[in-house]
Amino acid sequence: MADEIWDVYDVNRRRTGKTVIREQSWGFEKYHLIVHVCVFHPDGRMLIQKRAHEKKAWADLWEVSAGGSALAGEDSWQAAEREVFEELGLKLDLKDVRPHLSVNYERGFDDFYCVIRDVDLNQLVLQKEEVAEVRWATQQEVQQMEREHTFVPYFSGLIDFLWQIRDNYDGAICQGSRATEV
């Protein structure tokens, strides 16, 4: 597998023109961009994935539908499209779709996209190096996983907030965006 190369951002989320190789120590005041895609079923459940056993971070834990680091030259939406396709084999058109939530964290910026799709799990093509399995889960099931420490420990309350976004903006997510399967 080729080394991942990331753009380096400043504290104000501007690309610095520099890049860094993943796993390379790169100092303070340098940030990178990661993305997550939350696929919700029309009935309100979220598609979640179990991270592969071989993953360095959070192996064997459940997490949101897809996510990862933006590669050098990618905008947020491009990284989101690529990650969901690589990990799940699901094509989405997120061009001109703003992230529904952006979180600043110690090492960078994390953009969350929420889409509503009735996805047939049997049609997904899982990236074995990243994803062990997928399933639909209710908010209560994910909350239980968080209590049992079987779900990636995102910021406190973040997962519940994603459901609030889904519940309060589902018209915009469903019809007002171009986040459709292609």
Regions found by a protein language model. Name each.
Residues 1-36, 42:
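Acidic, metal-coordinating catalytic segment for phosphate/diphosphate chemistry
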Residues 88-92, 117:
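A broad structural signal for alpha-helix termini and local helix breaks/kinks
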Residues 23-35, 41, 45-82, 86:
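Conserved Nudix-box catalytic region and its N-terminal flanking loop in Nudix hydrolases
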Residues 60, 72, 101-108, 112-182:
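Nudix hydrolase/Nudix homology domain
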Residues 6, 45-46, 134:
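A residue-level structural signature of the nucleotidyltransferase/glycosyltransferase Rossmann-like core
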Residues 12, 41-44, 52, 116-121, ...:
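Short loop segments at secondary-structure junctions
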Residues 91-100:
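A short coil-to-beta-strand element that immediately follows conserved catalytic motifs
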